[in-house]
Regions:
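Sequence-level preference for short, compositionally simple segments enriched
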Residues: 1-214
Length: 214
């Protein structure tokens, strides 16, 4: 099969995987509505998802707070896919309209992240650098869930993890904490022995097809 043929088949498979039943107005978490393959969801997040940790100082309490977010944006025409993904994740999180004809799916409640989001990616691991972001994100989530971030030691652990997550620490955080006190931990390494599932390939529309041919 030619490269163009492979691309066409994967695009057809991708559409077949998520263009099933659609929840257009309400979220129905009935098991029979789960139409997405879990590897497809992982592949989709590898291509378009993000794991974020925000550390912000509260003006009222005068202390630092930590919030987490699992999210991704799509064009509004793909809103039905976001709704299916929300159903797949047991209805947690929310879908909001953004600017430039974008819609965004977010999960920010720590209990939902711990009990719904993290278990999925433990069972169906990410294959790109998103895997490293996920491991760091998970470690921060566990600190927050156990309220360890409320202590100075726990907050320093969060900052050390965040320093290696995505773009690292903001200028404000670097100026607010002594440089010697925050040491970025080494980013977890992505396994080079992972077996690529065809459903992952169909889901990872943002990941280039060259992984098939190198």
């Amino acid at each position: 099969m030619t490269l163009d043929g492979v691309k066409a088949k994967l695009e057809l498979d991708r559409k077949k995987f998520f263009l099933g039943k659609r929840s257009l107005h309400t979220v129905n978490t009935n098991q029979e509505n789960y139409t997405l393959n879990p590897y497809f969801v992982t592949g989709f997040v590898d291509g378009d998802g993000s794991f974020m940790a925000l550390v912000v100082k509260s003006k009222s309490k005068k202390r630092w707070g930590v919030s987490l977010r699992f999210s991704f944006c799509l064009h509004k025409k793909d809103r039905p896919l976001l709704e299916q993904i929300q159903i797949f994740f047991k209805g947690v999180g929310g879908i909001t309209d953004g600017i430039d004809d974008l819609v965004q799916y977010n999960v920010s409640a720590i209990a939902d992240i711990i009990h719904v989001v993290i278990p999925h990616f433990e069972k169906y691991p990410l294959l790109t650098q998103k895997y490293s972001d996920f491991r760091l994100f998970k470690s921060i989530a566990e600190l927050v869930y156990n309220k360890e971030h409320l202590t100075e030691e726990g907050l320093n652990k969060v900052l050390s993890l965040k320093a290696s997550l995505n773009k690292g620490l903001s200028l404000n955080l670097k100026q607010s904490f002594p440089p010697l006190g925050i040491i970025a931990i080494e980013r977890p390494k992505v396994s080079e022995d992972s077996i690529i599932n065809p459903y992952w390939i169909a889901g990872s529309r943002g990941v280039r097809l060259k992984v098939l041919f190198i």
